[in-house]
Amino acid sequence: VIVVLGILAVTAAPQFINFAGDARSGTLDGVRASMQSASTLINAKAKVQGTDESQTTDATNSPTVSNNGTDIAVAYGYPDAVEIDGLLDINAGDFGVVYETGTDAEEVSSTLIYAVGQGVPEADATSGCFVRYSEPTSAGSKPEYEKIDDGC
């Protein structure tokens, strides 16, 4: 009887305990924290350079902040959505990127960083396994960092 219960426990437990999903969700927490740190750093540099209240108008006239010799386009002092993935030190084998366009098809309004192997989310997805960075939309506003992990 004890052996049978042991076998049942070993075969049934993985169905109730989602270690892999919890690990992926935890990794997304790290990605979100990295996004927050990177955008806070760029915002501090934007304030020093006086571009913290400037709006990104288009790809050719964006205000920029110099970061380690690279110009980073900013929207109201925070990284433009298309720039955020370049500021993160993430492995391309583990994570993918999807850009969501706003009302202007040329302008990216948010970026999704998703866990590879969990399906590529649509740009406007509301479920899956990803972190969405949305750039600020007005002076004084801050970017949004949304973790979606119901598909991990």
Question: What kind of feature is each model-predicted range?
Answer:
Residues K47-C152:
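Periplasmic/extracellular, small/polar-rich flexible segments of pilin-like filament-forming proteins
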